[in-house]
Structures are given as C-alpha cells and as structure tokens.
Amino acid sequence: MAENRASAYTEGVPCWVDAQLPDIEAGKRFYGELFGWTFEDIDDLDDTESETVRARLDDEPVAALVRKTDGRMPTVWTVYFHTPDAGALADRIRAGGGQLVTGPRRAGGRGVTALAADPQGAVFGLWQPAGHPGFGRRHEPGGFAWAELYTRDTEAANAFYGDLFHEALFGPGADPDFGRAPVSDVFPAEMPPHFLVHFQVADCEAALGTVARLGGRVRVPPFETSYGGVAVVSDDQGASFALLQG
C-alpha cells in the first residue's frame, strides 16, 4: 500500500536507503529515468561527508545518491534501520557479535548515522533522525518496498536481528519490511552475505527493459517470493538492487 510521510518508525524498521556511486550525475540519469525521481543537493553536509543528492518522488524524499571518494569501496545500495539512539544500538550490535564499520557520527542537522556489520559480515546502516526522518514515500512504484538479507545461516541471523529489533520483527502489528533468506536460494553459494534493497515497480518486465536500455544488467531474472515477484538488477555503475512487482 502506498504510504505518504512515512516518518513514524519502530526501531529496526528500514527508514532510508542510499547508493554509493563513483558518478552521481550518471546515477541521476539512470534512476531519474527508471523511477521518475528528481534530485536536490543536500546543503548541510559537514567536512566528513561526500557529495550527496537526495532523490524525490512527487516531491517527497525516497533515497540518496552519494559520491564514492575511495575507489576501493563497493558500489552498493545500503539500507538504514531507524533507531532513537544510535549509540545504544551500536553497543548492542557489538554485544551481539557484530561490528561497527563507521560512526556513530552526526550528519549535519539531519541526524546521526553509523554503518555496522552483522556477525556474518552483512553491512547495514543506522539512522537516528533529527531534521530528516527518512522516507517521505514508500510502498509505491518508484519507492522503497523491502530489504532482504541473504545470509549463510538464517537461524543465526534471526537470533541476531531478533535480539536487536524484536519489536519491529515480532511485536504486535509488526510490519518490518525486512526478511532473511539463504544466499543459495537466489545467488551462488560463495556470494558473501548482504542486504538487497527492493524498489517497487508497476510492471517488472517493462522496468527490466528500461534497465537494459540505460546500460544496467539483469542479474537474476524474475522469480517468486513470499512477498511478491522479484528480479535482481544492477545499474550502469554496478550497484545491485531488486525490482518488486506491486
């Protein structure tokens, strides 16, 4: 269901996504045409932040594109989970066997962010909002729809994230937008554990044609999941994401 002003989140619900890209202008062309996004510069970046643009759908924020400053870093989409206290959540991540990759650190007046890795190495973000609560729209074509963790050990993943985000995953009325599945269900068994960000599309086959025309690639052709029909693609710079028919 389409949702506007999606700003009230339980801790552990995905509230934002960004793509680390070597070429932001190319990213704007690709995603602007694929999803109908428009873009605006973020003008309160601090000295530690790379050039960043915010993507909008019908004038509401839906994602960000961030320029990579180190070519050794992956070109990747990252999902951020809402938290009211990034420092406390970072402590719980470490106590559960995960690691902090960066932060927590303040991101201008927008909030506090951090990057973490779970015990199997899958990287995810934390977002403690201030001026920027997260998605303004989701669950509609062109917006965030789901995040799937592909992992080698689903029982261990369920235990780790269940301890971190119990209310979001298992509490009354839980609607987490976040699932777990074995890597080998979709990808080669040797692929590292990772989160796959899903964007909703009205017509998956048409979207796949647009991806190919824009220089992207189909990584996994359409298949059925418990949450809908999915195809895995990558943009023209190599960042992978999924299209979810809805």
Model segments located where?
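Vicinal oxygen chelate
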Residues: M1-Y9, V13-P22, T52-A55, K68-R92, G96-L149, G171-P182, V186-F187, ...
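Core segments of cupin and vicinal oxygen chelate
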Residues: A2-E60, A95, G103-G111, L149-G179, ...
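Conserved short beta-strand elements that form part of the metal-binding/catalytic scaffold
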Residues: E3, W37-P74, P119, V123-A130, ...
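Residues in flexible loops and secondary-structure boundaries
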Residues: G27, D43, D47, M73, ...
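Short alpha-helical basic/polar micro-motif
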Residues: R29, D91, P119
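Short gly/pro-enriched beta-turn/loop segments at secondary-structure junctions
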Residues: H139-F144, T154-E155, L164, P192
